[in-house]
From Swiss-Prot:
<dbReference type="InterPro" id="IPR011250">
    <property type="entry name" value="OMP/PagP_b-brl"/>
</dbReference>
<dbReference type="GO" id="GO:0009279">
    <property type="term" value="C:cell outer membrane"/>
</dbReference>
<protein>
    <recommendedName>
        <fullName>Uncharacterized protein HI_1457</fullName>
    </recommendedName>
</protein>
<dbReference type="GO" id="GO:0015288">
    <property type="term" value="F:porin activity"/>
</dbReference>
<dbReference type="InterPro" id="IPR006315">
    <property type="entry name" value="OM_autotransptr_brl_dom"/>
</dbReference>
<comment type="similarity">
    <text>Belongs to the opacity porin family.</text>
</comment>
<dbReference type="InterPro" id="IPR003394">
    <property type="entry name" value="Porin_opacity"/>
</dbReference>
<keyword id="KW-0732">Signal</keyword>
<feature type="signal peptide">
    <location>
        <begin position="1"/>
        <end position="19"/>
    </location>
</feature>
<dbReference type="Pfam" id="PF02462">
    <property type="entry name" value="Opacity"/>
</dbReference>
Length: 178
């Protein structure tokens, strides 16, 4: 029994020597598109904070919180709509280990929340709603290793936030490994 415990502990230490926890912060721009609604053409400022675990040199998982910012739109030139989007996601990554440059691809599943405000243009009517939907996304990017524990990150991503809401974004940030 003691030998099994010692072997298990050594195996755990060997795994943890290769694996790393990390925290990553990203800033960028997002273009949210709402089907059948004339949304503004200007991108919104997006922020993301992630906590992840690198299982080995190729596979990692991350949990993230993303703030998509505020988007304004109008429907049939009668109603002005304002949407503030937030998301909590789980992303699986595959890293292509090419020395200091590491291209990667990922798939993201998320729960997305939106605070929606609608105002009628010609009447004094205002409505508020909060909606939550499940979404899926894909991303690709590259990380450049600055030091053993710090990497510069850039990526492009597509997220289907709801059946009629999608997002295309570009982000850059820093990853700190422990």
């Amino acid at each position: 029994m003691k030998k099994l415990l010692i072997v298990t502990m050594l195996f755990t230490l060997a795994l943890s020597a290769q694996a790393q926890w990390y925290v990553q912060g990203d800033l960028g721009a997002s273009k949210i598109d709402i089907t059948h609604v004339n949304s503004s053409n200007s991108p919104s400022f997006t922020q993301r904070i992630s906590v992840g675990y690198a299982f080995d040199k190729n596979f990692r998982l991350a949990v993230d919180y993303t703030n998509y910012g505020k988007v304004t739109a109008n429907y049939a030139d009668v109603v002005d709509v304002s949407l503030k989007g937030k998301s909590l996601g789980l992303t699986g990554f595959y890293d292509f280990d090419l020395a200091d440059f590491k291209p990667y691809v990922g798939v993201r599943v998320s729960t997305n929340g939106a605070d929606v405000t609608a105002n009628a243009r010609y009447y004094r009517i205002e409505a508020f709603a909060t909606e939550t939907r499940i979404g899926i996304g894909a991303l690709a990017g590259v990380q450049y290793k600055l030091t053993d524990n710090v990497a510069l990150n850039t990526n492009i991503e597509y997220n289907r936030l709801a059946s009629n809401v999608s997002d295309v974004g570009v982000k850059a940030g820093l990853r700190f490994s422990f």
